[in-house]
Amino acid sequence: MRLVGLTGGIASGKSTISNLFKASGIPVVDADIVARNVVQKGTGGWKKIVEAFGNDVLLENGEIDRARLGQIVFSDPEKRQVLNRLLAPHISSGIFWEILKLWIKGCKVIVLDIPLLFETKMDQWTHPVIVVWVNEATQIERLMSRDGCSEEQARNRINAQLALDWKKSQADIVIDNSGTLDETKEKFQEVLRNVSEPLTWKERLRSRDGLFSVVVCTAVGVLLAQKNLL
């Protein structure tokens, strides 16, 4: 099984690449979706957020007010660290279970779409690591257009993350998403060919069929050894 890491920066276009993988038939584990699930009303993640930030971050129906919580953590680095620390175990567990379900289905290649791939050290479990990159001016412009925020707000949100240029330097594959959608799709095809190459022996060993084969061969070997000893 090949675990492909996919990350980028806010408004870099990572979701576009993630959707292209899905459209190509490659399963994607989306950490943002996992994160939303682990903070639903009544969950352990929800309880930790309420304990740390109070009822001010709740909507009338008791769900987390994501916009309000975002305003708080993007303007205060310490509170952002608190939030990440509280939710990291829940999100990691959620990602693990999504991977396990796909492993049981026999999927050979799985993309992990994780905004905090480097921050959570999950890049160590993925190869290749793909970073979707744009220059800062484009990133600010797209973020302002998408979210209707001011330039200052856009810069604050960008600065709240690891520098995209640093992520780029750590990547195995970089997708420059500064151009048009058609240009990005063309670049994606090369990336798709790369991640769809035959699995290495280590990756085959991690796959469902590979592990099954190892267990069966080991069991047969043990039985034969016991027979020879009798």
UniProtKB/Swiss-Prot annotation:
Name the EC number(s): 2.7.1.24
The main enzyme category here is: transferase
Q: Which Gene3D superfamilies match?
A: P-loop containing nucleotide triphosphate hydrolases
Q: State any GO CC term.
A: peroxisome
> Which Pfam families does the UniProt record give?
CoaE
Which one of the record's GO molecular function terms can you name? dephospho-CoA kinase activity
Q: Do you know which InterPro entries this protein is assigned to? A: Depp_CoAkinase, P-loop_NTPase
Domain DPCK: where? 3-206
* Residues that, per the record, bind ATP: G8, G9, I10, A11, S12, G13, K14, S15
Q: Report any one BP term from Gene Ontology.
A: coenzyme A biosynthetic process
| Pathway(s) it belongs to | Cofactor biosynthesis; coenzyme A biosynthesis; CoA from (R)-pantothenate: step 5/5
Q: Which reaction does it catalyse?
A: 3'-dephospho-CoA + ATP = ADP + CoA + H(+)
> Could you tell me the superkingdom of the organism this chain comes from?
Eukaryota
Q: Which controlled-vocabulary keywords does the entry list?
A: ATP-binding, Coenzyme A biosynthesis, Kinase, Nucleotide-binding, Transferase
Question: Which pairs of Cys residues are joined through disulfide bonds in the record?
Answer: none
Q: Which family does it belong to?
A: Belongs to the CoaE family.
What is the annotated role of this protein in its UniProt record?
Catalyzes the phosphorylation of the 3'-hydroxyl group of dephosphocoenzyme A to form coenzyme A.
Q: Which PANTHER family match?
A: BIFUNCTIONAL COENZYME A SYNTHASE-RELATED, DEPHOSPHO-COA KINASE-RELATED
- Specify the protein name: Dephospho-CoA kinase
Q: What is the lineage of its organism?
A: Eukaryota, Viridiplantae, Streptophyta, Embryophyta, Tracheophyta
